[in-house]
């Protein structure tokens, strides 16, 4: 009974982490694609690392490393790797909770910081081709103009702005999109946390099962 339970747990955790690792590869690949083809980061000279591509590359890399430890620890029944996997997942979970709290506490300050970065980038629109391309992409995609409206463009709105003079600003449009999709974002976040907790539970259970099996066969 002990050996069959051990095998079941081992393969469940292995395939769980294999799927986790594949997801990490996809996220990393998408992040690299964004870094190559997406130039929105030029809008934030005050926070140059604030790009979706950088975030996806970092998250994808971390997921791949953690999932690799989980795969190797489960298939080799290595308690050291399993505990490393557990600790890393725990750190990631705590980091996510901390980040959520910080975003909630400093939401206003972050909004001001982002708004300042966008305001500075508007002044570079006619002198920097990358900034121009980024703004044109955002305004065309969101059907918005400037940060708060057409008045942000002192020399007149560019061609990428919608023709409607009462069009919304891109900052308000982006915030509206976020709030309208808040439920889905919340569900995805909760699912990720549940998966992490399940991974930690599987790792601990397998670790305990290895001990029990070792004692049973007299190792």
UniProtKB/Swiss-Prot annotation:
Cytoplasmic side: 1-11, 70-80, 207-219
UniProt-annotated glycosylation sites, renumbered to this chain: 129, 148
Chief site of localization: membrane
Bilayer topology annotation: Multi-pass membrane protein
Transmembrane feature ranges: 12-32, 55-69, 81-106, 182-206
Effect of residue 44 to A: About 50% loss of B-cell chemotactic activity
Alphabetized Pfam families for the sequence: Tetraspanin (PF00335)
Gene3D superfamilies per the UniProt record, alphabetical: Tetraspanin (1.10.1450.10)
Subcellular location: Cell membrane; Cell junction; Membrane; Synapse
GO cellular component, one term: synapse
Gene Ontology BP, a term: signal transduction
Tissue: B-cells, monocytes, macrophages, neutrophils, single (CD4 or CD8) positive thymocytes and peripheral T-cells.
GO molecular function: identical protein binding; protein-membrane adaptor activity
Superkingdom of origin organism: Eukaryota
Keyword field: Cell junction, Cell membrane, Glycoprotein, Membrane, Synapse, Transmembrane, Transmembrane helix
Extracellular side: 33-54, 107-181
Documented effect of changing residue 43 to A: About 50% loss of B-cell chemotactic activity
Family annotation (InterPro entries): Tetraspanin/Peripherin (IPR018499), Tetraspanin_animals (IPR000301), Tetraspanin_CS (IPR018503), Tetraspanin_EC2_sf (IPR008952)
CDD domains: CD53_like_LEL (cd03164)
Alphabetized PANTHER family for the sequence: LEUKOCYTE SURFACE ANTIGEN CD53 (PTHR19282:SF39), TETRASPANIN (PTHR19282)
Biological role: Structural component of specialized membrane microdomains known as tetraspanin-enriched microdomains (TERMs), which act as platforms for receptor clustering and signaling. Participates thereby in diverse biological functions such as cell signal transduction, adhesion, migration and protein trafficking. Plays a role in the activation of monocytes and B-cells. Acts as an essential regulator of B-cell development by promoting interleukin-7 receptor/IL7R signaling. Also promotes, in B-cells, the BCR signaling by recruiting PKC to the plasma membrane in order to phosphorylate its substrates.
Family: Belongs to the tetraspanin (TM4SF) family.
Quaternary context: Interacts with SCIMP. Interacts with CD45/PTPRC. Interacts with IL7R. Interacts with RBL2 and PPP2CA.
Protein's UniProt name: Leukocyte surface antigen CD53
Gene: CD53
């Amino acid at each position: 009974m002990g050996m069959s339970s051990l095998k079941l747990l081992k393969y469940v955790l292995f395939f769980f982490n294999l799927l986790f690792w594949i997801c990490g590869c996809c996220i990393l690949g998408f992040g690299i694609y964004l870094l190559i083809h997406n130039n929105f980061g030029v809008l934030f000279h005050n926070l140059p690392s604030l790009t979706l591509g950088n975030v996806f590359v970092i998250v994808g890399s971390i997921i791949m490393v953690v999932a690799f430890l989980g795969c190797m620890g489960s298939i080799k029944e290595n308690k050291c790797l399993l505990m490393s996997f557990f600790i890393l997942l725990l750190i990631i979970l705590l980091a996510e909770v901390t980040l959520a709290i910080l975003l909630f506490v400093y939401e206003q300050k972050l909004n001001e910081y982002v708004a300042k970065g966008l305001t500075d980038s508007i002044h570079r629109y006619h002198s920097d081709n990358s900034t121009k391309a980024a703004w044109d992409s955002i305004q065309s995609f969101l059907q918005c103009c400037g940060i708060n409206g057409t008045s942000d463009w002192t020399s007149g709105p560019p061609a990428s702005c919608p023709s409607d003079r009462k069009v919304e600003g891109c900052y308000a449009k982006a915030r509206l999109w976020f709030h309208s999709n808040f439920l889905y974002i919340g569900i995805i976040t909760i699912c990720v946390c549940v998966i992490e907790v399940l991974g930690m539970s599987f790792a601990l259970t397998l670790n305990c099962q290895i001990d029990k099996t070792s004692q049973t066969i007299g190792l």
